[in-house]
Regions:
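Charged substrate- and nucleic-acid-binding regions of tRNA-handling and nucleotidyl-transfer enzymes
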Residues: 1-51
């Protein structure tokens, strides 16, 4: 959820939270259900790779 995304990425509410949420939704559609640790790792990698 958005609160967890903000905590993990240490970001305030805003557009980036929605983008991260969409990334996780797409990831789940592509890969199927993931455990929390794998999802967090993917989220952090996605965030670090952003321009």
């Amino acid at each position: 959820d958005g609160t967890a995304i903000m905590r993990i990425l240490d970001i305030p509410p805003g557009r980036e939270v929605g983008e991260a949420y969409q990334f996780l939704l797409n990831l789940r559609l592509d890969r199927g259900p993931m455990d929390a640790a794998s999802a967090e790792e993917a989220l952090r990698a996605w965030w670090a790779a952003r321009p």
